[in-house]
Amino acid sequence: MSPLECSECFGDQLLHRTYTWQLTLHSRPNYTRKRDTRSESLEIPISVVLPQRGTAEPFPRLHNLYSTPRCAQQAALPRLSRRMASQHSYPLNRFSSVPLDPMERPMSQADLELDYNPPRVQLSDEMFVFQDGRWVNENCRLQSPYFSPSASFHHKLHHKRLAKECMLQEENKSLREENKALREENRMLSKENKILQVFWEEHKASLGREESRAPSPLLHKDSASLEVVKKDHVALQVPRGKEDSTLQLLREENRALQQLLEQKQAYWAQAEDTAAPAEESKPAPSPHEEPCSPGLLQDQGSGLSSRFEEPKGPPARQEDSKELRALRKMVSNMSGPSGEEEAKVGPGLPDGCQPLQLLREMRQALQALLKENRLLQEENRTLQVLRAEHRGFQEENKALWENNKLKLQQKLVIDTVTEVTARMEMLIEELYAFMPARSQDPKKPSRV
């Protein structure tokens, strides 16, 4: 080994020296292959640049043995053959395996910033790497404490990390897509839930309306008296300490009564609107209907119209006046004493007896109205049944009248035919009387 000086490799810095060692490797012939008894020898040049004492750079650096030579001395160095070329195109690894001074302790990679690509040899389909002064199989080699991981190892680690990151990104992307799909499905389900809730509320409201619909002519006619009761209840709804709970109950009852009144008014207005065109579309009774069934249709028509029209006649008016008087008396009993007692007692009542009494009376009145509502509903159903029967009777009477008319026409035709035949017989007899008697027994002609 002969050291060579190189002053042009690092930019005319004369304080650097370059040392080159020539390693020669002899291998035995491979007798396993037939006709292959050649021996192989490899020459490996190693060039190291070391600074002298007192230089500015504290660390030695290596030449890149496979780059373009920068000086004549470097160009004169022997090159590696093709079989000794590096198997990687990555930058040179850092090398600190061979100690420069055998008496000194080998320096670590942090102390020596040496770029070095370990030589590799491929023999019989196996790759060998020069490590720690000996050739080691690449698959079975161990990492030396003075050897840093190779570039391929770093590259593999980097690729493994990239692959893991790519896998994680793909998993995150798939999870985000699944989350997005689940959110869309959740939105659709929430919309369907809202639509179903709206339908359910509408269904409940329609059921409540059907149940609360009830004809109440008394409330329809005497709405003024109920308005007075409402005003009295509103006056009673002033907060008074102990009476707050009772007043709240009164408010709820008042709201229920208002809703019931509005529903009944709407129902009766609709019933009157439907009854008016039905009465207008009724066919006028023909004059021939009266002899067939004079009393049946008239009685049923009067009975039906009396329920849906305004009461006519003195008995109906007397009954309505009696009911109105009873209702007004009940309302006066509910509202009158409360006003007098409030005037006597004053704003602060010791206990809530008066509102409770008024609430009981209102409940009784509401129960009576509900009973009357049920009775009127039953009467309305019976009236509908009677109306259907009335229509059936009308059709039967019409058929009977047409049958009687046809019978009368048939009778008239028969009478006219008999009269014509009788006159023809009389004329034939007169003709035979004027004709001369040809024979004693003349034959009479047949009837025409």
Curated annotation (Swiss-Prot):
Signal peptide: none annotated. InterPro entries: Chibby_fam. It comes from Homo sapiens (Human). GO terms for molecular function: identical protein binding. Homodimer. Binds to NEK1. CDD domains: Cby_like. This is Protein chibby homolog 2. The modification Phosphoserine is found at S41, S86, S89, S97, S124, S144, S148, S150, S212, S225, S335, S338. The gene is CBY2. Testis-specific. One of its GO terms (cellular component) is cytoplasmic vesicle. Keywords: Coiled coil, Phosphoprotein. Residues 279-291, 307-323 have a biased composition (Basic and acidic residues). Belongs to the chibby family. SPERT subfamily. It holds the Pfam family Chibby.
